Amino acid sequence: MVPIGVARGEVTAEQQEKIRAAMPDGPRVKVDKPRKLLVWSRSIGFQHSSIPHGAFATTVMGEKTGAWEATETTDIKMLLPENLSQFDGLVINNTTGPWITPLDADMQGRSDTKEAYEKVLRRSVLDFVAAGGGLIGYHSSTDSNYHWEEFGRLIGGYFNAHPWHEEIGVVVNEPKHPLSEVYPAEKFRITDEIYQFRDPYSRNALRVLMTLDTQSTNMKKNDIHRTDSDFAISWIRTYGKGRVFYGSLGHREEIFWNPMIMRYYRDGIQYALGDLEADALPSAVVNPEGYKALFDGGKLDAWQFREGGWSVDGEGSLALGKGGGYIWTREAYENFILDLEFKAAPQCNSGVFFRASPGNPVQGGFEIQVMDTAGKENPGKHDAGALYDASAPLANAMKPAGEWNRMVVICSGPLIQVILNGMVIQDVNIDRWDTSGRNPDGGENKFTAALKDLPRKGHLGFQDHGTPVWYRNVRVKPLP
């Protein structure tokens, strides 16, 4: 049982009974052994009265379903690698403010600075998720760590006012999605404080599962900032080998004894823990609208290349010919989603170029490495999935030589995300590469200009390094 914090609110005996009664009796997916969840409940800013209710509900849900065991804490030492590694998932429970920054009391017994300690804690959380840990966010977890850009992208967005605290309509965006199966209808109504989000929130990066129903909700409220009517309520994503689930419901205490929402949160937690399989490709990727075929097994009219260097083989794949060289799109692209499949031969060394200059691709463009490095532990900045010489992949998602891989490259301004076989392996802001020949971690790179200064518009292309490689189902969706 987790301790109940009176200072943040109190879970009364009556509320405890309501929470217990609302919990699902079993897991969505049975597990051989309960997972271990760390429930992080430190708030630096506004203290939600529902913090102990979220912790209590998470613990009781694990007990009733047998799917996990929960431990609540506000001790920042628990986020250190040696402690966090004891858990399978991390629940960010209605936190607010810069909780990743150590307080004076956290520095007792330490000889380093707050800045150095925070750097260790940041790296620990990111590495935990990239290595396969689950991240679960309740409500105001998005009202946290505004000074830590990578956290904003990891959790999916930042809070930008709550225009509604009343009954509102909810749209279940994908009723047939595995996480949506708990809902009996495509729309329902609920009362809670409802957030709107700002950057880095984007459907280019997230699979949005629930949104505000603007047709049945009062849209004349103050503080409505979004003009696109995209008011997300819940989403999922991947990060390396890890998974992220966020649900914005949970300001009001009674959310944690709403049976339908608790079933949904159970499934979201099991998804984040890796026990429930669900497609997390971003909503903009799976939305078929706006795509243009660059190669679909037929003609190569969209491309320019040396005659005989590339051709369509008998299986309808784009294949490398003798002395092929580079192959480039005729059009240049700035912001886009590039979706393709590739197959590498043994010892293959190729690459997917974007925002590149065909006349100087090595220094005038970006490359995602295509290489036969499947199974390699701790891949580096020259292995499959690397942003070549600039950023190692978060995880090795490459399939063995001879098998088809699916790669999605998403570029929007300075943000570059690469998804390989369903796993986000690059999630970078190239504005952080502000020094020529140097990466943000202090390591060297080949570039004579800072990556942030490279052109934001250029051609798409594939590289020939003399070993067989095949591409198919290549399409692009221009973005604003």
Q: Predicted segment positions?
A:
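Short beta-strand segments enriched in small/hydrophobic residues
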Residues: 34-45
